[in-house]
């Protein structure tokens, strides 16, 4: 089930995988700049 949760996080917040630094900024701002 851990895999499902890990897969949901990126899919729910941002469908496009970005750099870890970008992910933090995206989560903070709530907008994907990819």
Swiss-Prot record:
The keyword Cell wall biogenesis/degradation does not apply. Processed by the macrocyclase-peptidase enzyme POPB to yield a cyclic decapeptide. POPB first removes 10 residues from the N-terminus. Conformational trapping of the remaining peptide forces the enzyme to release this intermediate rather than proceed to macrocyclization. The enzyme rebinds the remaining peptide in a different conformation and catalyzes macrocyclization of the N-terminal 7 residues. There is a cross-link at residues 11-17 (Cyclopeptide (Ser-Pro)). Residues 1-10, 18-34 form a propeptide. One of its GO terms (molecular function) is toxin activity. Keywords: Toxin. InterPro entries: Amanitin/phalloidin (IPR027582). Belongs to the MSDIN fungal toxin family. Cyclic heptapeptide that belongs to the MSDIN-like toxin family responsible for a large number of food poisoning cases and deaths. Cycloaminide B is non-toxic to mammals but shows immunosuppressive activity, probably through the inhibition of the action of interleukin-1 and interleukin-2. This is Cycloamanide B proprotein. It comes from Amanita phalloides (Death cap).
